[in-house]
Amino acid sequence: MLMLLASHEQDIAEMKITKNGRVVSKQQDNREVGLRHYMKDHYPAIKIINLELPIDGTRQQYDNMLEQFFTGHPNIHHCITLGSKAHVMGDFLLRTNRREVQIMGYDMVKKNAECLRQGSISFLIAQHAYQQGYCSVDALFKAVVLKKKIQPVNYMPIELLTPENVNFYRRTQL
């Protein structure tokens, strides 16, 4: 979805939340592998510029790092965050009145939703956490209690949330 907007760019940013220089979740790591593979296959001329923010950073540290990043990369207009902290950049963009940067983020957490409504995040990928949790417990019950064979892979739906449809997202729907 981001590439519909950024296909003409030379560079895009990827914001990562890290601890000791490593991403903090396996999901975030897997998403990055998928992103880089997709970009290599479909947009090989576009360079991904990394921005690493420490998980235990303060707002002031984030502001300093983001200011330095955007000053050093004035042609960055699109950013993807592969974890649930898109709001860190979204808040910064709102406070510094940078309207030319579009963010794609993950996870429908409250702070991300607020930034989406205010326009500093362009869209979010929501993954129906309640449904995932239900399916996980259901599979565990079937495997352990009922001794049934379960499928090792369970594909789940995602939703693309925008400022126009975010208020209709049914977070707790099974």
Where do the protein language model's features map onto the residues?
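Glycine-rich, charge-decorated loop segments at or immediately adjacent to ligand/cofactor-binding or catalytic sites
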Residues: 110-119
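Short beta-strand elements at the ligand-binding edges of bilobed clamshell
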Residues: 1-4, 118-130
